[in-house]
Amino acid sequence: MESGDITVRSNLVKYTFRNSSTLILRQGQLLDKIGHAKEIFYTYSQGVYETTIILSNSAEEYVETCFRGEQLVSKAPNLASITVKLPEENSNCSGLYYYIFKKIAWEGINLLEVVSTTNEFTLIVSQDDIDKAFSVVKRLNIA
């Protein structure tokens, strides 16, 4: 991916589980099952009290099996993602995320989750909002 590249994925599902002493083991089991499949979208975020997994709905059965017995807080199907590759100097750019989120909010798009690494960010939205969200992101000119 080059700076400014945009990747859109659809048919995603989000699971949020209450943290437990066994949850990280369950994640390992899931990764054993899906780790070889390059076409599967997967992101994992662990907070203080909850853990969220967002992945392709084609892997739902693995989540249902691997995380059986864990406390499910919520499940949200019919999601989509937009991933943007940022310039390497983005870490030194004050207000970058404010600028992006403001534009998204002005269009009335509900951001369900935001996932980021050093040089890319991923917005998770309802599949119903993906076209509008893509249009907004495409116009941002953040390359």
Q: What name fits each language-model region?
A:
Residues M1-A143:
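A conserved regulatory-domain signal marking ACT and ACT-like small-molecule sensing domains
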